[in-house]
């Protein structure tokens, strides 16, 4: 086996094993109502179809338009709350906006991006948020432990991917999509080591939803520093998910230590 490939596999296994050990320590808020969770399951399924190019754009948009009212009802009926930006939390525990890649948010490139292009999308309408991890083992070099990914907003988990390996062409690796009815936005957290939530979970700002990892087509390669890929899509009047640069929000909100 190629020596460099062997090292990459060892690092990925280290990230994954460390995350699994941490998982049992995290408390996740699960809905308690008996109301059907079909809308969450359906959105997760739709997202998978979009990723794999198995559904046409117009049909996918119509499905989203049908699912959103059901998701909102499920959210509020199961104790979901609206939170203003004053309650939002920086998405990496123990870090702040100084670790956002680029200069003044320059890593954000919306041109060419369309959610409905799935795994073949163009652009980079997101902020990459880096941890201190020079040896690429998914551990903070100073604290020698995993870094928790926190939900920036409140919302409901609508899609996740919890399985990934180096043979996959999935760019986001292990990811989470959260719908926040308050801001009418989808929030995307990608390249995670371990996903700690599931579709239909009701989330509040600052809750641990994952640990930072190196999963994804490019993110697992040694040349890529360990980071969270964080994106916000705002829904327009037709509920079309449009890229929104949340850099100003990221630099203004408080970090959780």
What are these regions (language model features)?
Residues 135-136, 163-166, 183-185, 194-196, ...:
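Solvent-exposed loop/turn segments at secondary-structure junctions
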Residues 4-13:
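Sec-dependent N-terminal signal peptides
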Residues 15-148, 249-257:
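Polar/charged, compositionally biased leader and regulatory segments
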Residues 127-141, 185, 190-192, 232-241:
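Small beta-barrel nucleic-acid-binding modules, principally OB-folds
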Residues 169-178, 201-257:
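Conserved, short, structured surface segments that act as functional micro-motifs
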Residues 118, 138-141, 165-170, 219-224:
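Short consensus segments that form the blades of beta-propeller domains
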């Amino acid at each position: 086996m190629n020596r460099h490939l062997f090292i990459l596999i060892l690092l990925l296994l280290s990230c994954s094993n460390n995350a699994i050990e941490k998982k049992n320590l995290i408390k996740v808020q699960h809905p308690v109502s008996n109301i059907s969770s079909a809308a969450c399951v359906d959105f997760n399924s739709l997202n998978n179809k979009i990723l794999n190019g198995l559904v046409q754009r117009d049909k996918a948009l119509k499905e989203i338009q049908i699912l959103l009212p059901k998701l909102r009802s499920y959210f509020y009926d199961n104790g979901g709350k609206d939170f203003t930006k004053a309650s939002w939390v920086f998405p990496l525990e123990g870090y702040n906006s100084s670790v956002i890649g680029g200069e003044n948010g320059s890593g954000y490139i919306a041109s060419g991006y369309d959610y409905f292009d799935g795994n073949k999308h163009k652009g980079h309408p997101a902020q990459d948020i880096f941890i201190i991890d020079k040896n690429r083992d998914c551990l903070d070099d100073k604290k020698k432990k995993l870094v928790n990914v926190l939900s920036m907003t409140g919302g409901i988990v609508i899609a996740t991917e919890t399985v990934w390996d180096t043979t996959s062409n999935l760019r986001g690796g292990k990811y989470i999509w959260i719908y926040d009815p308050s801001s009418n936005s989808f929030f995307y957290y990608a390249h995670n080591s371990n996903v700690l939530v599931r579709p239909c979970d009701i989330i509040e700002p600052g809750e641990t939803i994952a640990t930072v990892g190196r999963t994804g087509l490019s993110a697992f390669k040694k040349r890529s520093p360990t980071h969270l890929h964080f994106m916000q899509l705002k829904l327009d009047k037709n509920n079309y998910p449009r890229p929104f640069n949340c850099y100003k929000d990221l630099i203004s909100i408080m970090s959780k230590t």
